[in-house]
Amino acid sequence: MSQWNQVQQLEIKFLEQVDQFYDDNFPMEIRHLLAQWIETQDWEVASNNETMATILLQNLLIQLDEQLGRVSKEKNLLLIHNLKRIRKVLQGKFHGNPMHVAVVISNCLREERRILAAANMPIQGPLEKSLQSSSVSERQRNVEHKVSAIKNSVQMTEQDTKYLEDLQDEFDYRYKTIQTMDQGDKNSILVNQEVLTLLQEMLNSLDFKRKEALSKMTQIVNETDLLMNSMLLEELQDWKKRQQIACIGGPLHNGLDQLQNCFTLLAESLFQLRQQLEKLQEQSTKMTYEGDPIPAQRAHLLERATFLIYNLFKNSFVVERQPCMPTHPQRPMVLKTLIQFTVKLRLLIKLPELNYQVKVKASIDKNVSTLSNRRFVLCGTHVKAMSSEESSNGSLSVEFRHLQPKEMKCSTGSKGNEGCHMVTEELHSITFETQICLYGLTINLETSSLPVVMISNVSQLPNAWASIIWYNVSTNDSQNLVFFNNPPSVTLGQLLEVMSWQFSSYVGRGLNSEQLNMLAEKLTVQSNYNDGHLTWAKFCKEHLPGKTFTFWTWLEAILDLIKKHILPLWIDGYIMGFVSKEKERLLLKDKMPGTFLLRFSESHLGGITFTWVDQSENGEVRFHSVEPYNKGRLSALAFADILRDYKVIMAENIPENPLKYLYPDIPKDKAFGKHYSSQPCEVSRPTERGDKGYVPSVFIPISTIRSDSTEPQSPSDLLPMSPSAYAVLRENLSPTTIETAMNSPYSAE
């Protein structure tokens, strides 16, 4: 089943997550129509190869043209219109930057895999539970309900203000009518009494309505103040925490559109309220009287409403997408000097008057004194205007795409880190400033990214990413740049949940409870990973017992191995991966001979091995583990092909493949058949093919096991011998001679 078909079968809560990352950059219609073709292209490689990206973009447009031809025959007018529009947008947007479309599509496919993995994982860790609590959802609904109620109340006071204006005009008309009456009519006692009574009643009604309107406006200001400080800003902080979690591989964060709707409605309501207060001032200027409530209350209400507007705007300026290098989309907030990164800002108050009128300036470490001697400046376009065209949903946004951090030389002439921290523990901040001028108000806004780590060499990326993980799982403080002076510990349950996210986001499949238990045992003697705490040093700085590397270095090497060499096998769930040798033997001891499992090496960085079970002649259960394969060997031969072609020479027997069933009882070819690069090579005699022909050759993974040993002596050595030549040797040499040659000290050369 294709990945897209699997996505379409997800529950609605997961489909909503999928909907979040499909926009005009890569419309879902294209994903649906070209699903099979899209999934067979290597978009990740193309995202770093301009030539390949250009070819894929052209092929994508060709595929669209073919779809257009098909739907034209079906006379589907709406689909024809949409496809033509999409093709025009894609060609215009990506013609000069084909690598960007590869990055976008690669990210979408990766997020699909992560969501599919999350949907299939029964485990929900403490961090994810906290983000999905029912109280949070209830508060979201309450915020939206109260914002709507405030908007309705302001509409009511708008009607009250107009009624007051009409009432005052009527009073003014009657008063002026009296002034123009004949002197005789004015002297009439009856007429005079009636007119005075009428005017007094109208004045009393006017006074009552003014007080009533001001009372309603006061209530609106009070409710808005309470809503903002007790619920709306809490909701914004929750979104920022969800963003932190999503940045380190957790569930996709959403809810920003709902927040924008609330912020915008409140801003519109407050500006409308200010206009109503200005109208009341005009009415009071035209006509006032003793005890008039407008002069006594209007100024204070206007001041409070204006303060709320300032506060609302200051909180509405957010970093929608944190700084990230396009070449490493799964490692946001790690930036390399002189390499471009992207970052996106958004104003949650969407007013048409602000489109293209708000210019944002980016800077780094503004007014911040870091512990490092390293100082940076931003090169590239660091001032841009916000516009609704920057976003598919019309929000007021700005995206910086060409910023580059450049390290400055210190005044002493030194360069680099001379403080107490490693470079990968130094935190920096990117600040964004703008000014809003609207309806007579001038509001200065400033916001900052989450802390970023600056590296000068890609080899520093793994440890820099570890710092980003630890920071964002440990604190909600977005500006604690001295965090690593005294980094707090985290619970083991939290950390292991984040480790599972690394696998689901980076290689498309998270970890199950058994795998997490093994990691827990690796980090501590406890197997219950919901309890206990872990320090930063234990995670990333101290070597594992008896090893020359840290826990994080070991895990990162496994992630890299999966990503580059065994990704399809991992996604299919056929790699048990994290299992100790002791547990491995418990699992295999009662299984059929030839049953094997795949696990990651605990002693070799970035290594994967397989262990199989068989029986000796006297019925004794034996276990054999091949020397771990690393990325060097896997670059020469695909792992699935190794499992298919692996041979063992044991005692006087001919070479045979001992791998029959993937644990627990899956036939090997059924599990891995679709990943074989070709059909198994048949061993045959060499044939005469003339001067122009060659005898075909293949790499054969082969091991020898002595009769007095249960372990392969030359595990995973690749024998560069043609099948034909090997067949000739078998016919002309005895098994003993072949075994002697295989055991030669030169056999592994």
Swiss-Prot record:
Molecular functions per Gene Ontology: DNA binding; DNA-binding transcription activator activity, RNA polymerase II-specific; DNA-binding transcription factor activity; RNA polymerase II cis-regulatory region sequence-specific DNA binding; sequence-specific DNA binding
Residue list for modification Phosphoserine: S722
Keyword Acetylation: yes
Knockout or disruption consequences: STAT4-deficient mice are grossly indistinguishable from wild-type mice. However, the development of T-helper 1 cells in response to either IL12 or Listeria monocytogenes is strongly impaired. In addition, mice are acutely sensitive to methicillin-resistant Staphylococcus aureus (MRSA) infection.
SMART domains reported for this sequence: STAT_int
A biological process term (GO) from this entry: leukocyte proliferation
Entry PTM: Acetylation at Lys-668 is required for JAK2-mediated phosphorylation and activation of STAT4.
Record flagged with keyword Lipoprotein: no
Tissue-by-tissue expression: Expression is restricted to testis, thymus, and spleen.
Localization per Swiss-Prot or TrEMBL: Cytoplasm; Nucleus
Phosphotyrosine modifications at: Y694
Modified residues (N6-acetyllysine): K668
Residue stretches making up the SH2 domain: 570-665
GO CC terms, sorted: cytosol; nucleus
Assigned keywords, A-Z: Acetylation, Activator, Cytoplasm, DNA-binding, Nucleus, Phosphoprotein, SH2 domain, Transcription, Transcription regulation
PROSITE patterns according to UniProt: SH2
Recorded superkingdom: Eukaryota
Record function comment: Transcriptional regulator mainly expressed in hematopoietic cells that plays a critical role in cellular growth, differentiation and immune response. Plays a key role in the differentiation of T-helper 1 cells and the production of interferon-gamma. Also participates in multiple neutrophil functions including chemotaxis and production of the neutrophil extracellular traps. After IL12 binding to its receptor IL12RB2, STAT4 interacts with the intracellular domain of IL12RB2 and becomes tyrosine phosphorylated.
Subunit text: Forms a homodimer or a heterodimer with a related family member. Interacts with ARL2BP. Interacts with STAT1. Interacts with JUN; this complex efficiently interacts with the AP-1-related sequence of the IFN-gamma promoter.
Family the entry assigns: Belongs to the transcription factor STAT family.
Name this protein carries in UniProt: Signal transducer and activator of transcription 4
Record lineage: Eukaryota, Metazoa, Chordata, Craniata, Vertebrata
